[in-house]
């Protein structure tokens, strides 16, 4: 997803998506540690999406303050 798609979502949707991404990241890290994970580029994608969601949430908080 790109930043514009995240900005179009509500705060509750963003928070739910952030939790979902963190669960996915945790699962990937565990699979990587066990040697079962092959698509290491997906870890980078998830990490960057987490950063995008957190940025949009802080952007919304600053705009409303």
Swiss-Prot record:
TM segment ranges: none
Protein name: Large ribosomal subunit protein uL29
Pfam family, one: Ribosomal_L29
PROSITE patterns in the cross-refs: RIBOSOMAL_L29 (PS00579)
GO-annotated cellular components: cytosolic large ribosomal subunit
Keywords in alphabetical order: Ribonucleoprotein, Ribosomal protein
InterPro entries for the chain: Ribosomal_protein_uL29, Ribosomal_uL29, Ribosomal_uL29_CS, Ribosomal_uL29_sf
SUPFAM superfamilies with a match to the protein in the record: Ribosomal protein L29 (L29p) (SSF46561)
GO biological process, alphabetically ordered: translation
GO molecular function ontology, one term from the record: structural constituent of ribosome
Gene3D superfamilies the record matches: 1.10.287.310
NCBIfam families: L29
């Amino acid at each position: 997803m790109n930043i514009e798609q995240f900005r179009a979502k509500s705060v509750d949707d963003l928070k739910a998506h952030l939790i979902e991404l963190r669960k996915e990241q945790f699962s990937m890290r565990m699979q990587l540690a066990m040697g079962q994970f092959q698509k290491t580029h997906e870890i980078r994608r998830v990490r960057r999406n987490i950063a995008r969601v957190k940025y949009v949430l802080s952007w919304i908080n600053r705009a409303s303050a």
